[in-house]
């Protein structure tokens, strides 16, 4: 097929290019918490109600397409890229998206660094887990900056709707946009990290276009 194929053994749909005609979406969910994940890491999460309790921002049909979502940035000596290609759109040496039953894996490789971003919603808990695995395929030591990003919405269209504190569970929806910076390690970034203090500053290497 032109853009992907079915992997019957793993029960996955495998997408071989990030340049699909439209975002190709996988639906993840448990009892109360749900996420939509595109083949480039776009999408959004919501708690019980997709319209009234939307938690992160996402442009599905509007231009530009597939912006915002479940993003992880990798800074390798000034080369900034994403495992799912968007939004940096740095050309990858290899790319694969695996949409499975209840999970999505975005696999990208650039300059000898392989990254796999696995997204899933665990049963029995109201959260999304983004698990990042990094592999250095070269013989030389490498130093990387890795940081995650979400843009919270918390409700109806954010330009008009008031947000009631009673709408969402307490504390765990107080997110920051850059929950962690991880150096030379494999890390996990969950989008329910609480933050009681001020939003931490963005790293100096923040790509152009990020807030």
Language-model segments: which ranges?
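Anionic coordination/interaction segments
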Residues: 1-211
């Amino acid at each position: 097929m032109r853009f992907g194929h079915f992997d019957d053994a793993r029960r996955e749909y495998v997408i071989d290019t990030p340049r699909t005609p439209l975002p190709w979406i996988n639906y993840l969910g448990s009892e109360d918490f749900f996420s939509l994940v595109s083949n480039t890491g776009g999408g959004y999460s919501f708690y019980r109600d997709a319209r009234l309790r939307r938690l992160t921002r996402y442009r599905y049909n509007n231009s530009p397409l597939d912006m915002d979502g479940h993003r992880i940035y990798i800074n390798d000596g000034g080369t900034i890229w994403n495992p799912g290609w968007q939004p940096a759109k740095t050309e990858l040496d290899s790319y694969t998206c695996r949409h499975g039953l209840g999970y999505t894996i975005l696999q990208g490789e650039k300059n000898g660094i392989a990254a796999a971003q696995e997204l899933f919603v665990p049963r029995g808990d109201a959260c999304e887990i983004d698990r990042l695995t990094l592999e250095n395929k070269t013989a030389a030591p490498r130093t990387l900056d890795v940081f995650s990003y979400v843009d919270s919405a918390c409700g109806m269209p954010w330009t008009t709707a008031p947000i009631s504190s009673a709408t969402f569970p307490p504390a765990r929806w107080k997110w920051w946009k850059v929950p962690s910076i991880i150096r030379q390690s494999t890390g996990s970034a969950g989008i329910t990290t609480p933050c009681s203090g001020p939003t931490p500053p963005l790293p100096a290497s923040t790509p152009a276009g990020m807030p």
